Every structure is written in C-alpha cells, then in structure tokens.
C-alpha cells in the first residue's frame, strides 16, 4: 500500500489556539467571550470593545504558546498515522514573530515530528500532499488534495458539502476517513494498475 503525505493545520486542528486566545483576552480585559461566540474568522467581532491591536497582541507573547494543548485525539491519531509510515507535515500560517515559540511548543506536544515536518505558509494551496486537514475553508478550496474541514464554531457558516469538502468533528472520524480514502481511492487504483 502506498503511503500518504498528510498535511494538517496546527491552530484549532491539532491544538487549541482559539480557546487559549479567548481565555487570555478574557483574563486581560474582563470580558466573558466563549468559543461559540467566535462565529467567523474575524476575532475582533467577538471582542467589539477591544481594539484590533489588543485582540492580536496576545498572539505575540510566549505565554499563549505555553498554554496551548492538543485537541482531543490529535496526538493519538497523528502518532498512529506516523507509525503506519505516512509522511506527516504540519502546515501553519504564522506571523514571523510567533514562529519560534509556536513551533517549539508544537514539537513538545507532537514529539514524533521535527522541524523538517513543519511548513509555514499563508498559501496552503502551494503545498503538495494527498490530504489536507484544516479548519479554514479558504485553505482547502482550490487545493489539489483530499480536503477535510475540521469543524470549529468559526467555520459553521461554510457549506462544505456543496464544495466537495468533507466536514469532520473529531480526530477519530479523521482517522476513519483516511483509512476509507486509502481503501476506496488508493487501493482500487493500485488494483487497477497492478501496483
């Protein structure tokens, strides 16, 4: 069986950045915003009393990256895929000021990865792989890979089904979808061509 190149996003797919971001803003400014209040990509809309600078400044602190933790099932599923021999690449869009603390923390949380398996880009469609798992519809549309949208409150308004994108809710579902993809797409093609 051919091994896959699996691309996956970091923030709000592998780890809980949005939760930590909201928590830090609530602590700093006495607000009471919840994850469900963030209904789109513009975090400032969930914090209308704060300036854009106040909302985004916390991302440039080391503290936020120390707080992030893996989303449920992420480490286990990614470790399993790694053990099965698939190539894993964490593909993330990051401000240059956050790269080092962010990547250092991600490598702590996902010790089976190293720097060679972290790709930092704002244009994920330029990265080649078999599968991309992301919470940003804009990262999936137009890419040349099997597309999995990781469900988060900020992407609920996106109609994934109408664009041929698979919306999934847990890492366990993602693992099952990848196994199904291997069997139905790759296995059938290998049988046909005799690979």
Where are these regions (language model features)?
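A short acidic, often aromatic-flanked loop/helix-cap motif at beta-alpha or helix-coil junctions
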Residues: 41, 123-129, 155-157, 171-177
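Structural recognition of alpha->loop->beta junctions
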Residues: 105-121, 163-179
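Conserved Lys-Pro-Asp/Glu-containing loop-to-beta segment of HAD-superfamily phosphomonoesterases
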Residues: 119-144
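Acidic, Mg2+-coordinating phosphoryl-transfer loop and its flanking beta/alpha structural elements
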Residues: 135-170
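Substrate-recognition element of Asp-dependent hydrolases with the DxDx(T/V) motif
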Residues: 65, 69, 74-106
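Short, basic/glycine-rich phosphate-binding loops at helix/coil junctions
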Residues: 46-61, 85-88
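Active-site neighborhood of HAD-like aspartate-dependent phosphohydrolases
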Residues: 1-54
């Amino acid at each position: 069986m051919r091994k896959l190149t699996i691309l996956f996003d970091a923030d709000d797919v592998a780890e809980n950045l949005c939760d930590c971001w909201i928590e830090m803003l609530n602590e700093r400014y006495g607000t009471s915003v919840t994850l469900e209040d963030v209904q789109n990509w513009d975090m400032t809309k969930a914090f209308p009393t704060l300036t854009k600078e106040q909302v985004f400044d916390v991302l440039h602190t080391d503290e936020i990256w120390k707080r992030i933790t893996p989303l449920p099932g992420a480490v286990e599923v990614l470790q399993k895929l790694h053990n099965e021999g698939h190539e894993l690449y964490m593909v993330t869009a990051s401000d240059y000021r956050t790269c080092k603390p962010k990547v250092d923390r991600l490598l702590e949380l996902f010790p089976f990865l190293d720097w060679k398996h972290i790709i930092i880009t704002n244009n994920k469609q330029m990265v080649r792989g078999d599968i991309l798992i992301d919470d940003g519809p804009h990262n999936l549309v137009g890419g040349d890979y099997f597309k999995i949208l990781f469900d988060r409150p900020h992407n609920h308004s996106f109609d994934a089904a109408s664009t041929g994108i698979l919306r999934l809710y847990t890492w366990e579902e993602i693992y099952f979808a990848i196994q199904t993809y291997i069997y139905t797409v790759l296995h059938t093609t290998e049988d046909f061509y005799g690979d």
